[in-house]
Amino acid sequence: MKINSLIIVVLLLILTSCGGEESYDYYPKPISGHRIIFPEKAYKNISPDCNYSFDIPNYSNFLLDSLTNTCNGNLVLEQFNATLFLTYIKIDTNLMYNIEYSRKLAYNHSIKADAIEEKVILNPANNTYGMQYKIVGNAATNYQFYVTDSSDHFLNGALYFNVAPNYDSIKPTLNFIMEDIDHLIETIDWK
């Protein structure tokens, strides 16, 4: 009888120590990534001493290629550790060669890509036509495009992140930057 009452007392002590008003439910922390704080969408117009001008995001810097003294430039997106490389070509004779070369540049990443999504660019108001390539997967670049006025000007762009490719990790940032690149393309003004 003494043992039974001792067992009952111990069980009551254990049960009362596990509950009450100060009881806390402990759960393991969920696995999560870093929180990305995106800046507000605001743009500034740049007009380098070249045959084009366009709007760029306020959080970026545009640098012309000073080594080759051409109208090639880099749109540096420092906050996101990314750069949009822009190559300007004055069309002399062969527009189709430049279009095919841009397509090959995009499809060179098909080895690592899960898919390449093409989107036609048609903007008759600004006399701008071209193609966008969204490269899905762990490729070196996930976004490329070319635009032209079909007679004098050709601009090719490729977005690179300065990190090892991991599509799932960069996808939110990529989607944010792609909206700004789309705005850049929409606001191109050929001179």
Where are these regions (language model features)?
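Sec-dependent signal peptide recognition
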Residues: K2-V9
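Hydrophobic core
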Residues: V10-T16
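Long, amphipathic, charge-rich alpha-helical segments that form helical bundles/coiled-coils
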Residues: S151-F161
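His/Glu-rich zincin catalytic helix
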Residues: T87
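Short, surface-exposed beta-strand/loop micro-motifs that present aromatic residues
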Residues: G73-L75, N142-D149
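N-terminal targeting sequences that direct proteins away from the cytosol to non-cytosolic compartments
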Residues: L6, S17-T83, T93-V120, P124-N127, ...
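A short, structured loop/turn motif at beta-sheet edges
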Residues: N123-N126, V147-H153
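Short, Gly/Ser/Thr-enriched beta-strand-loop segments that form substrate-interacting elements
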Residues: Y129-Y143
